[in-house]
Structures are given as structure tokens and as C-alpha cells.
Amino acid sequence: MIDDHSSSSLVVPASIQDSSQGVLSAAVVLVMYGDYQCPRSAAVYKLIKIIRQELTVSFGEDYLCFIFRHFPQIQIHPQAQRAAQAAEAAAAQGKFWLMSDTLFDHQQRLENGYLVEYANDLGLDIPQFLKELSKQVHVDRINEDIESGCKSGITAAPVLFINNIRYTERWNTTDLMAAMIAASH
């Protein structure tokens, strides 16, 4: 757990501009600030995928809305910013979540050549993908995520907010799922 209690609330609420799985009117809105090169972010992302499946089976599709916001820590993860740009370029072609899965699964291989390989594997329009990366089309979008995280007191990823309240308990399936269920009541 990253402890920074300078803020316990999400200052910039979830919106349609966010990359999301589920509806914003869900009983539980989970916002994750993550870094594609950070091992802890990858572990939490994978944990959320498992929990999302379990909650969907138990409570239905519209119970949980999962939102991912970029918080690349370039001082310790030099490829995280470029990976975030690749995810946003994939999002422009409707493949944000598939690219995010791939980036977290292969976070030791985030150099440009690999990013193009992943884009190709996902069936993206490669000339468009490369154009967006070279022109840094998505940098402002990523910076908005970083700025929103900073406004909420975040200094390092990963950080989770459940229904706008920072999650500070243990990072495991049982505790995280219990916190989500409690937040929905």
C-alpha cells in the first residue's frame, strides 16, 4: 500500500472522458491510478480483473464500473509514459483494455518496437498508431490524469478510489471485494 493521506477523496470525479469498463451509474465506481511499468500496478490491475469477474457473476454487469487513469512515474519507470501513449492510441481505435492487458502482461518489454508489435497483434491500424505516437497526440490526456491524481494527493501509483474514497486497506481479493460491497450499501 502506498500511504499518502494528504487527501482521502477523489477530487476529479469519474466521467465519460475516462477509460471505463461498466456504466458510471454503477453501485461501485472504482478508479485506479496506475503505471504500466510498475509491478505493483500490474498486480493490482490483475486483482481488479479477477474481482470484476466475480462481482459481475454475483451482482450483474452494472454493479462495478472500473476506470483506469494514467499515473506514469517517469523518474523510476522511463517507459511508462510511452506505454500510456500507446494505450491511448489503442483507445482511439477501441482497444484500450486489450492494450492495457498486454502492457501489464509484458511490462518488462515496453520499448517502441514492442509497442508496435503489440498494436499489430491487436489488429490496430499501424500507420495511425505510429502517427499518434510520433506526434504525441495523447500527451495532454495523460497529463490530465496525472494532474487529477496530484489534486487527490497521489504521489505514486498504484492508488485506488472506491466511490470517490481512497482505498487504504490491504491489496488482496477478500479485503478489496469487501470494501467494494460495503461501499455499494
What are these regions (language model features)?
Residues S20-S25, S58-F59, G153:
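Short glycine/proline-enriched loop/turn "hinge" motifs that connect secondary-structure elements
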Residues D4-H5, S9-P13, M32-G34, Y45-T56, ...:
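C-terminal cap of thioredoxin/glutaredoxin-like
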Residues S25-A27, Y63, A83, A156-A157:
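A structure-centric signal for secondary-structure junctions around beta-strands
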